[in-house]
């Protein structure tokens, strides 16, 4: 993210959180912002993000006119707002959460093993296990001990 608008020592994520806190406080909406309600609203907004892509052949950027791009930008802002508010309500540091999750993803999806392969982890892992079983069966048939 672009850091030049955030005050010294504060991230833009912190600025967004504070802006959202103020918006909610001014409207006395915090009583409605339970983690469950925020997660539900996040899901709704994420679904609304799909609407401008409906019925497009591929959904590539070249198919999106300015009106659709504005709608997408606004829905992305809604998704981000609810994500930041949900994280705030649960005391989740989104930066740290992303670092933690990326470490897990790197272990789960090693680049040399999955490059160019869009299958889910369980699918390629199952294929690897099947290949291992087939190799073991071949070795057994050839008289090798496992």
Language-model segments: which ranges?
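Flexible "arm" and connector segments at domain edges
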Residues: 1-76, 80-146
